[in-house]
């Protein structure tokens, strides 16, 4: 596939998230997709997105920059939303937030097969002022994906 076609795959995935239509991801993300941060695959990513929708019903992603080289696509993304539902053990604050993310996806045969994403969660927590004042859960929170991984593994047991 061309570099532009690879970039289009990531753009379509972001559009699917913005439209809240995760079924569209099935055509864009390989069933054996592996996320290097979460150490799990496609279903965990969908669970994380659903959690975001619950915490931030107006959640929206905007691609600021997108670059492709070989089979990899890099994107700098800005996420916005209003915290009106529980998220990661934090009670709703009603605050509007905006945070940045950098994601790298490897694309093979028109599908994302591998991913790395770094979110600026410190900025997220600072804006929302949630870390010390609103967190219900007593579990340590090292990152949003680690938290989701913990919850997913508990459901399986």
Can you annotate each of these PLM segments?
Residues 1-157:
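C-terminal and inter-domain tail/linker signature
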């Amino acid at each position: 596939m061309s570099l532009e076609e690879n970039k289009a795959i990531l753009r379509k995935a972001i559009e699917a998230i913005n439209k809240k239509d995760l079924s569209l991801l099935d055509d864009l993300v390989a069933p054996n997709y592996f996320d290097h941060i979460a150490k799990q695959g496609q279903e965990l990513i969908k669970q994380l997105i659903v959690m975001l929708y619950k915490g931030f019903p107006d959640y929206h992603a905007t691609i600021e920059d997108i670059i492709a080289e070989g089979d990899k696509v890099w994107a700098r993304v800005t996420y916005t939303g209003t915290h009106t539902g529980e998220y990661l053990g934090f009670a709703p604050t009603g605050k509007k937030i905006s945070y940045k993310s950098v994601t790298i996806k490897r694309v093979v045969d028109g599908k994302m097969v591998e991913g790395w994403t770094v979110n600026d969660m410190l900025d997220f927590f600072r804006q929302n002022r949630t870390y010390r004042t609103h967190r219900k859960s007593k579990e340590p929170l090292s990152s949003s994906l680690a938290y989701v991984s913990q919850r997913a593994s508990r459901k399986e047991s």
